[in-house]
Each structure stands twice: as C-alpha cells, then as structure tokens.
A protein has these predicted regions:
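Transmembrane alpha-helical segments and their short flanking loops
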Residues: 12-31, 48-50, 68, 82-191
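Membrane-embedded helical hairpins/re-entrant loop segments and their flanking transmembrane helices
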Residues: 45-74
Length: 191
C-alpha cells in the first residue's frame, strides 16, 4: 500500500543522512498514522465507549459488555463492542464511530505537520500492541502522549451518545416507559 511506501520513504530519508522532516520530503500519512492513531483500539476508536461502559454505565447490559470488552479493546480488538452495543446499524452510535477517527486524524496530522510529534519511519508494531506502548515504539514519548490525547478525546466524543444508549437500555431493563423525560433523568445520573 502507498502508506507502507511512505513509511519506507521516510526511512530512506534517514538512511541518506538527512533529518526526517517535511522539508526533506518526509511523509505524514503512513501505515503507523493509520494503525496507531485512526484505528487504535479498533475501528472507530471505541475505547472511549468501553471506558464509559466500565466506569459510568447504569444499564446492566453496558456494564457487563464493558467488563467483557476492556481486555480485547486494549489489544485493538473491538468486535464485541461493534456488534453487541450494537454500533452496526445503529444511527445513534454511528455518529461517534465515524467522527472519532476523523477528529483523531486531524489532531494527529496537525501534531506531525507542526513537528510536535516526529514523523514516523518504517518501524512497524504488531496490530495487537496496546496503545501507549505502540506510540512509544513508533514515535517515542511524543507519539505515546499523542495517543493519550486522542484516546481521551474519544471518551468525550462518545460520551453524549453512550449516555443516550445507556439510558435507553436502563429504561428497558427497569421496565420504565421510554420517554424523553425518563431518558433525561437517567442521562443526568451518568457522568
């Protein structure tokens, strides 16, 4: 893929004795950019949703799903979340699922473009390498810190949508009528 080629080209710049900068022909969009900043913790960067489920959910379904999903999510496996929440065919959860990687790509691109984070070479890490560790390996402490930033952002992007879904689940579990008033009451109890 061209992203892998971009990583290799970045490595060639270093091998030639030049600094890896945009001025020297360095590339921003590489395989590491995609793997470690757009799909980290799985497609849609769902770790924010998982953290909500584990620590803040009121519904039994979300609490249990969060506990079952936190382990796989740390290793970039999020199928339990994608299909059990569900995110698939769910217009409420589709919004943060799409928006989160877009926001992450803009923030990551900016960080690389401005030099806050060094451009990535051809160092590849296995796709199951947990975040923060993978950031350290592909770009040093700056990339690890950037992962902390984008993963924290994922929590706040997912938060209003997760609260709505949790309120729907909680109302159903407690046999409450699903009305705006009921949902607002349950949402107010979250975070």
């Amino acid at each position: 893929s061209s992203d892998v080629c971009s990583s290799d080209l970045n490595t060639e710049i270093l091998k030639s004795g030049k600094d890896l900068t945009l001025a020297n022909g360095g590339h921003i969009v590489t395989q590491q950019f995609l793997d470690q900043f757009l799909t980290v913790t799985g497609a849609g960067m769902t770790i924010g949703l998982v953290v909500f489920m584990v620590f803040f959910a009121k519904s039994a379904q979300f609490k249990q799903l969060g506990r079952l999903s936190i382990g796989p999510a740390v290793f970039n496996i999020n199928e339990p979340i994608v299909f059990a929440t569900p995110i698939v065919m769910n217009p409420i959860m589709a919004v943060p699922f799409i928006i989160t990687p877009i926001v992450s790509s803009v923030v990551t691109y900016f960080a690389l473009y401005t030099g806050l984070v060094p451009l990535f070479t051809a160092v590849q890490v296995p796709w199951t390498t947990p975040p923060i560790i993978s950031g350290l390996l592909v770009g040093g402490w700056q990339a690890a810190l950037l992962q902390v930033v984008v993963l924290t952002m994922s929590f706040f992007i997912y938060l209003p949508f997760a609260k709505k879904m949790d309120a729907l689940n909680y109302a159903e579990e407690t046999n409450q009528p699903i009305t705006e008033e009921t949902l607002e009451k349950v949402e107010a109890q979250n975070v």
